[in-house]
């Protein structure tokens, strides 16, 4: 069984999901069930794609350029310029050994933010998504919920401290705690308007 499926079995999976299949009802339980039924598999597929790359170099090339399994740019990075993505790729390629020896997701994420903070157009969502994709290859996943623009809106709607960089998954309402930290990030981003 693949590593991502092991993570899904233990903690749940995740997915970047745009769906026209709207949830019926707005209770947290209903929204979480909708996420699990409709959206979870999409990020699982994305992460499995990165997990199965033949080498870290290839995973880094695809992750830094935000290229999906169809050879297209991921939706979250669709507005980034090729110059920004290329600048990120060049910078990350120079420290490939440091990246692939990160022991946990936080270390990988922090290294990406440190390396890319001054690359024009590259922000916290790109750093998170790239760390998640590279982390899938390395078998390391977030233990905390990382906040960026979309997820901050969801955290704020739940009355949580949306000004933090990360939140402990244990502070979320019980239905949301059924999800893994990277699923919670995805859930907040997808359902932020339903949480208001």
Describe these PLM feature segments:
Residues 74-120:
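Helix-hairpin-helix/helix-loop-helix acidic hairpins
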Residues 9-10, 22, 68, 84, ...:
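Generic detector of intrinsically disordered, low-complexity, polar/charged segments
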Residues 66-71, 115, 119, 134-135, ...:
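Generic structural signal for hydrophobic core residues of well-folded globular domains
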Residues 54-77:
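Extended, charge-biased low-complexity segments
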Residues 1-53, 108-109, 125-196:
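C-terminal accessory module of base-excision DNA glycosylases/AP lyases that mediates lesion recognition
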């Amino acid at each position: 069984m693949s590593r991502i499926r092991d993570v899904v079995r233990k903690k749940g999976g995740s997915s970047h999901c745009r769906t026209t299949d709207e949830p019926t009802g707005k209770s947290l339980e209903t929204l979480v069930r909708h996420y699990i039924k409709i959206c979870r598999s999409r990020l699982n597929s994305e992460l499995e794609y990165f997990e199965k790359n033949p080498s870290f170099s290839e995973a880094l090339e695809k992750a830094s350029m935000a290229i999906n399994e169809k050879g297209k740019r991921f939706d979250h990075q669709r507005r980034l310029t090729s110059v920004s993505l290329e600048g990120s790729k060049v910078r990350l390629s120079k420290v490939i050994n440091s990246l692939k020896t990160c022991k946990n997701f936080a270390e990988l994420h922090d290294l990406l933010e440190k390396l890319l903070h001054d690359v024009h157009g590259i922000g916290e969502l790109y750093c998170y998504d790239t760390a998640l994709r590279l982390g899938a290859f390395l078998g390391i996943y977030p233990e905390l919920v990382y906040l960026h623009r979309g997820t901050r809106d969801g955290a704020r709607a739940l009355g949580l401290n949306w000004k933090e960089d990360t939140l402990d998954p244990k502070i979320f309402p019980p239905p949301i705690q059924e999800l893994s930290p990277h699923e919670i990030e995805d859930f907040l981003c997808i359902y932020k308007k339903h949480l208001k």
